[in-house]
Amino acid sequence: MGKRVVIALGGNALQQRGQKGSYEEMMDNVRKTARQIAEIIARGYEVVITHGNGPQVGSLLLHMDAGQATYGIPAQPMDVAGAMSQGWIGYMIQQALKNELRKRGMEKKVVTIITQTIVDKNDPAFQNPTKPVGPFYDEETAKRLAREKGWIVKEDSGRGWRRVVPSPDPKGHVEAETIKKLVERGVIVIASGGGGVPVILEDGEIKGVEAVIDKDLAGEKLAEEVNADIFMILTDVNGAALYYGTEKEQWLREVKVEELRKYYEEGHFKAGSMGPKVLAAIRFIEWGGERAIIAHLEKAVEALEGKTGTQVLP
């Protein structure tokens, strides 16, 4: 078999900037993404897929908000919304990819695994929630909801108030062994969507927690668990850059992991955007991976061939 690659799809694989997130818009984006992935599979790579879910979970939380306000339907907790989004997005990707493979005469099995991601209940992130989720509220509404629901709310960049939740570090996946066995049997697996549903182990039981896990860091854990050769993060820029957005901007094409770690520790990459992608790439190479890639979604095939994107090497 060819090299095994874990592909982490960014939000633009589902919803482009300026789009509202209708089913038709999303399906059109997913079909374009499926064509890229099918081409990678046609070239002999073994593929495992993970994806983001930010806008979709935000949408589900709004749906629940409206359902509760209008019809008195109880809202579900965040971990359930995460699981719902994995089913929703996984369904779209697996259907589009199966159809695209069939067009090429390739009969491959494609499945989505609702994945639970283990976090440490003592992770300091639980004491300092920072990840904004769901809709914006005015200050009065936000503080009322905080009292009623026990939420922590913070003002978000002058745009209004939002709920914030912890973003703990992923330690592994409950379903890791199952995913690995499927991959070894030639199944294309979609897993750890949106970073997976965050869970803790308490008194021998698995228990969901209200948190959000970074999908690239969780994707890196997935890459370790399936013994991937390559970990490829696809996003809406051409790779990682030093001094991004300034006159001194310098794109990184090929970089050794120790050099990239130095840039990371110097604070070159923003915490909410490129930072976790770079950290995930570093972790994968330090674990023993052959190559990590950060590249534009539309250039996935070229990036895998080393022609574009940021290529991170041992």
Curated annotation (Swiss-Prot):
50% activity is retained after 1 hour at 100 degrees Celsius or 3 hours at 95 degrees Celsius. GO terms for cellular component: cytosol. It comes from the Archaea. GO terms for molecular function: ATP binding; carbamate kinase activity. It catalyses: hydrogencarbonate + NH4(+) + ATP = carbamoyl phosphate + ADP + H2O + H(+). It is found in: Cytoplasm. Its EC number is 2.7.2.2. Keywords: ATP-binding, Cytoplasm, Kinase, Nucleotide-binding, Transferase. Coiled coil: none annotated. It holds the Pfam family AA_kinase. GO terms for biological process: arginine deiminase pathway. Its main location: cytoplasm. Homodimer. Belongs to the carbamate kinase family. Carbamate kinase that plays a biosynthetic role in that it produces carbamoyl-phosphate. This is Carbamate kinase. It comes from Pyrococcus furiosus (strain ATCC 43587 / DSM 3638 / JCM 8422 / Vc1).
